[in-house]
Amino acid sequence: MPFALGQRWISDTESELGLGTVVQVEGRMVTVLFPATGENRMFSRAEAPLTRVTYNPGDTVESHEGWSLTIEDLTEKDGLVIYHGIHSETGEQVTLRETLLNHNIRFNKPQDRLFAGQIDRLDRFGVRYQCQMLRHKLATSDLLGLQGPRVGLIPHQMWIAHEVGRRYAPRVLLADEVGLGKTIEAGLIIHQQLLTGRAERVLVIVPDTLRHQWLVEMLRRFNLRFSVFDEDRCVEAYADHDNPFYTEQLVICSLELLRKKKRLDQALDADWDLLVVDEAHHLEWTEEAPSRAYQVVEALSEVVPGVLLLTATPDQLGHESHFARLRLLDPDRFYDYDAFLAEENSYKDVAIAAEALAGNAKLPDAAINSLTELLSEKDIAPSIRLIQADGIDSDVQQAARSELLQELLDRHGTGRVLYRNSRASVKGFPKRFFNPHPQTMPEQYLTAARVSSMMGGHKTLEAKAAQALSPEKLYQEFEDNSASWWKFDPRVDWLIAFLKSHRSKKVLIIASQAETALSLEEALRTREGIQATVFHEGMSIIERDKAGAYFAQEEGGAQALICSEIGSEGRNFQFASHLVLFDLPLNPDLLEQRIGRLDRIGQKNDIQIHLPYLEDTAQERLMQWYHQGLNAFELTCPSGHVLYAEFAEDLLNVLVGDDADELTNLLNHTQSRYKELKHAMEQGRDKLLEINSHGGDRAKAIVERLAQNDENTQLIGSVIRLWDIIGVDQEDKGENSIILRPSEHMMFPTYPGLPEDGVTVTFDRDTALSRDDIALITQEHPLVQTGLDLITGSETGTTSVAVLKNKALPAGTLFLELIYMADASAPKSSQLYRYLPPTPIRILLDKNGNDLSAKVDYASFDKQLSAVNRHIGGKLVTASQPILHPLFAKGEEYAQAAVDELVIQAREKMTTQLTGELDRLESLKAVNPNIREEELEYLRNQMQELNTYLDASQLQLDAIRMVLVSHV
């Protein structure tokens, strides 16, 4: 290369150094000073990775003194270029030697880099374009936020997340029956809200025992890094902020922490966007005396825009506590308990009409009359005629049914705030089989009971019943050695024999008391050496996690896990199918929660429920009430809570006494009332609620689209190429997985989210679901998103020169491919991306300035191109400059016209969608007070903001590829 002192060059490998000046040429070496950083670099003259910087007529350059020059001509003297042109400030004719150019110039615009000879590899241009296309596709997907989580594609879960996650500040009660996946639904909604920018700060309140489980679940399933806050963490955070809750965006804490006034005040002041409360059925409320826990959540719900309440046990027919939870979501709507009860009485007519619409038969007259009355403000006659007509296309009829059903759901009841799926409406559950195992009452227990009754003392009926149900506890009160009961209790003998005969099976054992669980573990270990682990409230969260993992381990793990009652809240063990109830809880909801640890979606086997009980005792009588009265062992019993409240006193008397006639009467009355409630629930609100909650065919359609996206091999190829270009080390591991590791030759110094020791990933959902240690890669995964950001946020692939070998075209024919980005700067929360996301615009110009992009698609054109090296590419660009300058101007004209059209389309789409939604909600507000004014105001403001942002839309040249035809 010919070098001369004072010439300006730029480093091909360190463009951030700015414009360099040749300060020494000696022998075979050249030294370049980069004044912007004050650094020197010495290069071999023959192989220096440097590009000579020269400008052309029409360019504007800046002097080191700060004034600019518009170049009209240039001359060369002693190897240095002298620019002649117009001074930007004085308008005079001036000259500027290249030595005096501003050294802070960086060539980050694609055309500047192209003319400076900073030309990228051909494959990098392709990857950059693919990255921009992937980002655009993701931003425009109405399934954004549903594809990425590592969860099964279960229709009702995806439907609820799709419906709720798209709302501004959703306020809903997720009340699916046990085992239907409320935590996953909440995680999907959180993931959607964060990914779409509708929320940035999230507070999750959970029972103390579930904090770590939520932390792991959010990270493992949703790639969301929450922080667990307790008192110690709050104290530590003071070093960073006066309010500890401001130190993290995503926080999990317990209600216990927020019972403290200081912590609650800080949480109230922390500007959360979304509040999530798990196990919300523990929030007790009466109008006269709401609990402290309820007051804490109520205070937060008044200042946080979005609220999700998760509860496994909402009352079915208008219980006060259920009303109280709805009141948290919308106190204006649910202001009076009596008014709420009165409204529920009208659900029957709505349910009948909804059930008729959900079927396939013609509508009976009663249903038509109900619909006409319920939707009186709307002309439904055309839809009714379509449904009732013969010979009409079934899809058209189904669309008419769906439209009326949606109108019904929108206008009546709690359809927008309450989602409740039952097992009756969701397929895929195993059967439950009840196996009672009667045992003889030990003499020791009979003696302890006699002594206790002789000693007298005043006890409540409930305390007496609890004592009768746990004779081992009563016995321990009279024994110094609390563990001795298990040496004679026949239930323990049965349990040991059962475990020995089922050695290959995992068995979950649940007892009411932690002391009982510990004693059982000791009995199994000391008497037979059976591997079992314990799970109780006295253990730390980490100890509980270890116990759960030890039980889950296939090789060398525990055969049995023995839980106290807390083991039946929040922990799931679908890999086991045998459940031993060592005793029975006095609450039907607790019994269902126990069984629900195994009876969940994902359970592959039928569930065997075993109950060793002592004959002719309170245990047997309670078992009979559950089994014969409620059928609670083999079926879920949604009315259990109501039935227990009605029959509690009679049941307690039966448990404490020994009157066979009383028991028979209780069972008969319970069975009769159970049937009444079951019939009432089928006739009432539940049908309508379930139709709305499981989504029907619409939910199936969402799942089908997600499954198709999972099979997208084009995406897999694009992501693999992305990692190849960045330089990520990829090692195949088995049929469906890859190990990713950082490499020494990566294009970027770090790859956020990629651990130093690597990570195992898969594109196959089933593989990821079966292996906790393998990440599921989709477009939404942080490793993909980060990779896209690394490429599109850098200069990678912004310039390229290629050769087209085609003898049908004259040699030397030039094409200029320009990739523009149409964009508008706006906060993510504005939702502008739904209408005008960053959109790639491809322009392919021939030498005459004609745009050929509509005739020549990217993929077929790209396949015909061959790469050229950087230096040859630089020479080709220099030789083609006179042609290129007018082509850039022409390309911008075409791109601007495309942007203008995109903005028109975006504005029309936005106006149509938001005006339609606003009109719908305003008309609904007249008949359904469940529509919040905040939602309407948000839509009005959003339309104004979006119009402003669209007015400021911009066009930016993102990448250039110059192509020359060659016959060689």
UniProtKB/Swiss-Prot annotation:
GO biological process terms, semicolon-separated = regulation of DNA-templated transcription
For this chain the motif DEAH box maps to 278-281
Residue stretches making up the Helicase ATP-binding domain: 163-332
The similarity annotation says: Belongs to the SNF2/RAD54 helicase family. RapA subfamily.
Q: Gene name on record?
A: rapA
Residues annotated for ATP binding in this entry = D176, E177, V178, G179, L180, G181, K182, T183
Task: Using the record's annotation, list all stretches that form the Helicase C-terminal domain.
Answer: 491-643
Q: What is the lineage of its organism?
A: Bacteria, Pseudomonadati, Pseudomonadota, Gammaproteobacteria, Alteromonadales
Quote the Pfam families the UniProt record gives.
Helicase_C, RapA_C, SNF2-rel_dom, Tudor_1_RapA, Tudor_RapA
Q: Name the Enzyme Commission number(s) assigned to this protein.
A: 3.6.4.-
UniProt keyword annotation of Plastid present: no
The role this protein plays is:
Transcription regulator that activates transcription by stimulating RNA polymerase (RNAP) recycling in case of stress conditions such as supercoiled DNA or high salt concentrations. Probably acts by releasing the RNAP, when it is trapped or immobilized on tightly supercoiled DNA. Does not activate transcription on linear DNA. Probably not involved in DNA repair.
Subunit structure and binding partners: Interacts with the RNAP. Has a higher affinity for the core RNAP than for the holoenzyme. Its ATPase activity is stimulated by binding to RNAP.
* Name of the molecule in the record: RNA polymerase-associated protein RapA
Q: Which UniProt keywords apply?
A: Activator, ATP-binding, DNA-binding, Helicase, Hydrolase, Nucleotide-binding, Transcription, Transcription regulation
A Gene Ontology molecular-function term?
helicase activity
Q: Which InterPro entries match?
A: Helicase_ATP-bd (IPR014001), Helicase_C-like (IPR001650), Helicase_RapA (IPR023949), P-loop_NTPase (IPR027417), RapA_C (IPR022737), SNF2-like_sf (IPR038718), SNF2/RAD54-like_C (IPR049730), SNF2_N (IPR000330)
